[in-house]
Amino acid sequence: MTIGLLLALSFLVSLLGLAFLIWAVSNRQMELHQGQAYTVFVPGEAGQADDATMAGADAQAAGPHHYDAVRAGIDAVSRRPVLILLASGVVWLALGSVFGVMASLKLHWPDWLSAYEPLTFGRVRTLHLNLVTYGWLSLTGIGVALWVAPRIFHTALRHPRLPILGAALWNIALAAGAAAIASGWTDGEEWLEIPWQIDILLAAAGACFVLPLLRTALNRNVGHIYVTGWYYLGALCWFPVLFFIANLPGLHSGVQEATVNWWFAHNVLGLWLTPLGVGAAYYFIPKIIGKPIYSYSLSLLGFWGLALFYSQVGIHHLIGGPVPTWVVTLSIVHSVMMFVPVIAVAVNQHVTVARNLWVLKTSVPLRFISLGALMYTAASFQGSIEALRSVNTVTHFTQYTVGHAHLGAYGFVSFVLFGAVYHTLPRLTGRAWPWPRMIAVHFWLVVAGFAVYFVSLTAGGLLQGLAMLDATRPFADSVTVLKPYLEARSAGGILMTLGHLIFAAHFLAVVARGRAPSSAAEASARDTIPATAA
């Protein structure tokens, strides 16, 4: 019964994507030509590289882009809610990173801080997962979306006070959820550990983000919805459905509960964080380079492929478990089908960057975003291959899976968001980053740290899996063979955390200086803010 309900709900999510497609076709959103890719620019802006952190720029040139004065009326409405969301995300990143390092160290120093219940492995690891997922990735992703969406819709954000209320509710809920997890009160499901009673606040907060974005889209001043808008609208429509169904108390139990759990857990990555990351990349890559994406037709193929194929991917995590074989097989098929939208995104974004490699030499935000886009391709290909039974036999229950999860959530989404914040904050505050060299230091710390982290978990996980498959070897061998790789993981995690702390301090230094005085052009543009936006 529950398996059937789950599949029905999965198809419902896919049908929601199909409904979007039908609406898009009927409203001529699918009449594609490359000219639609210029939606991200205002007249005269195309061909102008746009990055306030470019190497060699003096203090004056490092300020907001010339064409931002044209958008000042739009940006002024979004400024406060976006700044609150970004600041909240950065705080949760710093805190979540500390818990992540603690959890990593406990894997090879198991007795460290074990006398304190809130600091035992099970709790600090869960705190790390929830704080970076629902704190850093979600709040920052929403903040970037609420800043980008009005720009691509060419109209001011509607109901801008609602996201401020949503940010307050979300932060309160996340703080309460963290306290509950630390005390041992959880729902006991991966990615769903925060008690459902607290999740009600998160749901209310989510509504405060969805309504303004939908209203802004409905009141847009352009006929065509740029591909970034589709990803953002999809994310903010899919996630509430997933979150509500997975958190209904008492509806599922036993094997069915595990099935629903992984249906939700994987869709959080694919139908929530992925659209936030890919959508941001589709805006910032052409915006920083000053040229449109390589193929606009391919960009929409990538979105609709994600909408139609992804919702049933997660059950491959239960290969070998007591679930119907056909359900797992269906999930594997959908996992392999994901090659189609991923290749579309990969060709589009990588070719756009490859044709303009000179910008990478001067723009660190573009390095973050383009490297994040590369890691999206790698994580997606790896996930599709890992879903195959022959591969999963080796990698299941190993640290290989942990490395894969971080390749997507950190290597892809976090890197894109780092670049997005570096590009956005000077436009929110009117002030340049005070220590441009620290941006490069942050980049190399997290790149080096993540390289050590991912390579060690991938290699160690494969050795761990092979050791567990060898019936002639005791289980303890799979533990001892892994230890040096876990130590390397901790070293990589410490480097990443140092980068995060530099990022947080740099962010605070900009925000603490306050908003810079507006130019005459910006003041004039703000006078054109529509009354309906307030």
Residue ranges and their predicted role:
Residues 1-10:
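Feature marks short, highly hydrophobic, charge-poor N-terminal signal-anchor/signal peptide-like helices
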Residues 7, 16-38:
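Amphipathic, hydrophobic secondary-structure cores in small proteins
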Residues 9-21, 83-108, 121-155, 159-183, ...:
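Hydrophobic cores of alpha-helical transmembrane segments in multi-pass integral membrane proteins
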Residues 23-32, 102-116:
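Membrane-interface helix-loop junction between the first two transmembrane segments
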Residues 29-83, 113-116, 464-483, 510-534:
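Extramembrane terminal tails and long inter-domain/linker segments of multi-pass membrane proteins
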Residues 71-79, 116-118, 122-126, 156-157, ...:
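Membrane-proximal first intracellular loop
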Residues 188-199, 224-228, 256-266, 323-334, ...:
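Non-cytosolic membrane-interface motifs at loop->transmembrane helix junctions
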